[in-house]
Each structure stands twice: as structure tokens, then as C-alpha cells.
Curated annotation (Swiss-Prot):
One of its GO terms (cellular component) is cytoplasm. InterPro entries: DEATH-like_dom_sf. This is NLR family pyrin domain-containing protein 2B. The gene is NLRP2B. Induction: Up-regulated by inflammatory stimulus (LPS). Transmembrane segments: none annotated. May function as a negative regulator of NF-kappa-B by preventing RELA/p65 phosphorylation at 'Ser-536', thereby inhibiting its transcriptional activity. Through NF-kappa-B regulation may control cytokine release upon Toll-like receptors activation and therefore play a role in modulation of innate immunity. May also play a role in cell cycle progression and apoptotic process.
Length: 45
């Protein structure tokens, strides 16, 4: 996996360039991905 240092970008700077609408979409996507990861940790019965 490639680290953010190798990609040579600043996430905070990129987020600052997003419009408010894009920022809301990004946050929603992050929440969805995070929730999916949490659900994967729950053992299946």
C-alpha cells in the first residue's frame, strides 16, 4: 500500500478546495466506509 507521503499531497489542502456540497458528499462517503468497516468486525452468527 502506498503511504500519503509517497503520493505527495496534503489532504487538508485538498479538502479546503472542495465546495460545501462536495465536502458534504465526502463526509458522507467517509461515514459509509467507516460504518462498513465497523460492521465487518462484528462476528457473524
Amino acid at each position: 500500500m502506498v503511504s500519503s507521503a509517497q503520493l505527495d499531497f496534503n489532504l487538508q489542502a485538498l479538502l479546503g478546495q472542495l465546495s460545501q456540497d462536495d465536502l458534504c458528499k465526502f463526509k458522507s462517503l467517509i461515514r459509509t466506509v467507516s460504518l462498513g468497516n465497523e460492521l465487518q468486525k462484528i462476528p457473524q452468527t
